[in-house]
């Protein structure tokens, strides 16, 4: 998919049109961000910065297909995934603009079978989820 995005951006720029950024809607699953996926993300961010584009991760959340029976386990997975992602962004901060946005602030039910539960940085009562502390820790350690 991203190769088509890169081709499209190159085409638009060749026509003299302005393109400022690439955005990735990061609706992640519990098996997201393998080493291969992180390596490709690394390539994509570098490509964006080399081509004077900002790189934005938008709509970050975790989609859980099944009913959550072990919330602690899922929150641990969420924290690990977010840690990988945030550390990747921090590693690129001196190369160009990067941005991180969330898709909603609190956990909620989804309306489709692939996202029965949508987890964010706060629980349904707006108490911080463990991943929020993980994100803060990444930023504090990445300065």
Spans of model-derived segments:
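Distinct, well-ordered alpha-helical segments
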Residues: 1-15, 34-41
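Short hydrophobic alpha-helical module
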Residues: 11-15, 25, 47-54
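Short helix-capping segments at alpha-helix termini
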Residues: 14-18, 92-95
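Conserved residues at the C-terminal ends of beta-strands
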Residues: 18, 25, 103
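Short, conserved beta-strand edge motifs with alternating hydrophobic and charged residues
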Residues: 21-25, 56-59
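Surface-exposed cleft-lining segments at the edges of enzyme active sites
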Residues: 24-35
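Aromatic-rich peripheral "rim/lid" segments of glycoside hydrolase catalytic domains that contact
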Residues: 33-143
């Amino acid at each position: 998919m991203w190769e088509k995005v890169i081709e499209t951006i190159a085409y638009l720029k060749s026509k003299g049109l302005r393109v400022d950024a690439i955005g990735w809607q990061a609706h992640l699953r519990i098996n997201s961000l393998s080493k291969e996926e992180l390596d490709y993300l690394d390539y994509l961010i570098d490509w964006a910065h080399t081509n004077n584009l900002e790189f934005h991760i938008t709509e970050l959340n975790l989609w859980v297909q099944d009913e959550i029976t072990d919330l602690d386990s899922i929150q641990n997975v969420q924290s690990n995934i977010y840690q990988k992602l945030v550390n990747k962004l921090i590693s690129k901060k001196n190369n160009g603009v990067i941005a991180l946005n969330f898709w909603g602030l609190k956990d909620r039910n989804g309306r489709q079978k692939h996202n029965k539960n949508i987890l964010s940085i706060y629980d349904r009562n707006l108490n911080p989820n463990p991943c929020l502390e993980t994100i803060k820790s990444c930023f504090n350690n990445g300065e």
